[in-house]
Amino acid sequence: GGHLMKVSKEAMKDMYLRMVHIREFESKAQSLFADGKIPGFVHLYLGEEAVATGVCACLRDDDYITSTHRGHGHIVAKGGDLKFMMAELFGKATGYCKGKGGSMHIADRDKGILGANGIVGAGHNIAVGAGLSASYRGTDQVCVCFFGDASTNQGTFHESLNMAAIW
């Protein structure tokens, strides 16, 4: 049999609340986009809340993540601010990227969120670079690269695996 990780009730409650926050944020974004109130595009993370929450629950604040065009859930799970995120979706200067990044380009380096990316497969090499940086600096930080299956046929996926394997 496998080994089960013991998770405290407090940690389980925190993970549950993060999943709820992701679902509520995405549901609100979906509604506002459908009503034509959010400009541009919105790619949702509905139904995948547990993935980002479980992964990010194992990370420290100084660990890194890279994300995809469906990155809202990753940002929330890593501790992103919902108000800054929604402001970014609306193109407001109070958003994470001063309203210039929109839904697919949210970043918060202070929280280790190296950015979501609208280009399929563009986060792989950024994640490897963050991992290599941690290694060179002698820290025990990690970088998690969230990606979808469509990105595995991109050159950056294979190049990043190769780079990670050889250093």
Where are these regions (language model features)?
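Structural motif
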Residues: 6-11
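Cofactor-binding active-site loop characterized by glycine-rich and histidine/acidic residues
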Residues: 27-30, 37-167
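Hydrophobic alpha-helical segments at protein termini of multi-pass membrane proteins
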Residues: 13-16
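Short, Lys/Arg-enriched N-terminal segments with co-localized hydrophobic residues
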Residues: 1-4
